[in-house]
Amino acid sequence: MAWLAALLAALLAAPWLANDYLLTVLIIILYFAYTGQAWNIMFGFAGQLSLGHAIYVGLGGYAAAALYVHFGIGPWIGLMAAVALGAVCGAIIGFLAFRFGVGGVYFAILTIAFAEFARIGFDHFSWVGGSGGLFLPVANYSQSDIWNLRGKPIMFYYVILALTVATFLLCHVLLRSRVGYYWQAIREDEAAARALGIDTFRYKMYAVVISAGMTSVAGVFFAFYYNNLFPEQVFSIGRSIEIILGPMIGGAGTLAGPIVGAFLLTGLAETMWELLRAVGLDAPGTRQVFYGLVLLVIIIVQPAGVWPWLARLLGLEKPRS
């Protein structure tokens, strides 16, 4: 698609035209676009609502950061450990839920419970800092070391851009594969999908494990970008809500929805924050209030999300039925 190529070209050129603040905002936008796309596999494609996705961010971040801090193992090797840990955790949650028929809102509650268990557990896990947090060595910002993910913000920008593009392409392939068609059948009517001979347990497990593993990668990026991890920070319900806002606003179940939602939500939030700060109204919690208001408006005006409406308006893509 021509519009996708144009967007990618703009994103590739953006760091050379943006100041430090705008570059930071773009990194945050792409981070939420990536995590939103990973969550979109579980809910948007397969219809399994997770409200505890922060557990995978936390597990991935702690796995890679602990290996780096304690053993000097680089983040790219640590990333493999992070993906494995996240996927195993997702498999455990999925197996317990789907084997015993836990679905819908009860599955969502189960995911929150696991995230809370992880938060409490890591609060008392002294090897990774406990409640005091785990800190990575301060990076040398005069140069970039891609192998150790240490260096200038522009390096992190291109890393998260590459991850976001790769995830978009992977989801494009998955959605148009047999697995993707089975996911959509399960999402629309699981009983009917089962009656047609689809192994719903297996394909729901695929969705959970893939989504969990991909989200764990975001945890690695988070740890090395911010240089610290706190259980209250990475396992919180607020972190999970931040992940799902992009696809919910942009359009869950669509490929472009999480990206559009991340740009719209984070871009508007930062603009609003700057305007409020200019007049001295930058009170704590302002962003969260703004997120809630935007989500409320979208649910009322465009419950399917912004992207289906925008795609229909511009003739870019057929709306999802």
Language-model regions, residue ranges each:
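Transmembrane alpha-helices and adjacent helix-loop boundaries
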Residues: 1-321
